[in-house]
């Protein structure tokens, strides 16, 4: 039986149609899978921020239920960030060497387990230990998430959306921890345990998304996968001591004059400096192959010098931005609750616009980053945060909320909303493929240090003014101390804006072209979009 040409043409058309349908379905599945990957990484950011803000909310109730003295209460809040900050660099290196999915899944599972374990704590010692162990999960999740986003989203538009969504997870998590966590603490029978149940659920959801959506890790392009254990000890111990001093300096017996505080600060800084010199030595020996016994550096110092040193500037801008953002939030809360005397829920309502606009700034950034020069975004974000600090630095307690408090809450998150996402997009473009998670680790370390450093420095300034405080009237030194703290916050934001203006002068739109990085030198080859004209 013969086949006519007409039947053959029909068969060809049918096959072509089927192939087209299969390709369309595959493309749709790819889009859905990529969206779920982005959601999983954003969830990691949400879990991180929710955990930080929720702990601050539950501290008063926790202290009452577990009979924790106020002098030891600070350890509950600082134990987690202390451990997280110490192990971010280590996990960044592990992610780049051995893949990102496994650390992401491990971190999510670890976070869920030890967050749930916190609800069984019976005293401050067990709470401190569990909080520290919980911080290890966060240290694994965050660098892995940055590397996963860089691996998954290759096109400029997709990467832009992915990192702005990742950045938006921070204000969303802060809102969940503060608003929902505060409501759960006050309205549920489980009180302080309820926010930890919420975080456990979010961690499990992150784990499920990670297992399902994230692709298996591709093999590392680095042949030598040895870990620099000396460098790991130097940076982990150094950061541990520095963050410890920043969190405990104000509560020590003689505050910053306490001998062990001074000694630990000196030793911590010395170890961090020694780490950088050791990494530089290893990088030189390893690159020239003059010492086969040398392992690859834990973190290449040349990473900081990419794009003519602008990578280092970006890291320091992130540090200063977080100094400003979190010290503003800290002192705004204390102003409302301690100075004005508002209940916690009313304080949350007054700060609610900050959480909303924190998300909106990331949405706005998605539309602007491919059109507006990079330097303008970095400068304007921190400038708006500086204006928010200025409003609280000159605030009149008798004025209505809409005169000072509301515009400050609207403007304050601009620094974090613009600078964080811009920094991540910029740094992942100038870093090599096998350095993506390390970039995320360094950025997260800077945010951890910035949070502690900003609050610590502004507290020192606050304390220098507050001893003369006599009452809470408008022109009293008590008000002056809160204003002085916000002037310090303004200085951080202004320094960040100034550094961005100097470092990125002439830099064009980040996402107009694709950045190409020379693997030998690490310098930009096509740098019109990143390093200026």
Where are these regions (language model features)?
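Transmembrane core module of solute transporters
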Residues: 39-41, 50, 55-58, 71, ...
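Cytosolic juxtamembrane N-terminal segment immediately preceding the first transmembrane helix
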Residues: 1-50, 64
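Helix-loop-helix hairpins in multi-pass membrane proteins, especially solute transporters
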Residues: 94-230
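Transmembrane-helix exit segments and adjacent C-terminal regions of multi-pass membrane proteins
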Residues: 2-4, 25-28, 32, 36-37, ...
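Central cavity-lining transmembrane alpha-helices of secondary-active solute carriers
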Residues: 78-93, 138, 142-146, 352-365
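Helix-to-loop junctions at the C-terminal end of transmembrane segments
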Residues: 87-100, 185, 359-376
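Hydrophobic transmembrane-helix bundles of small-molecule transporters
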Residues: 187-312, 316
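Extracytoplasmic
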Residues: 33-78, 86-87, 141-142, 146, ...
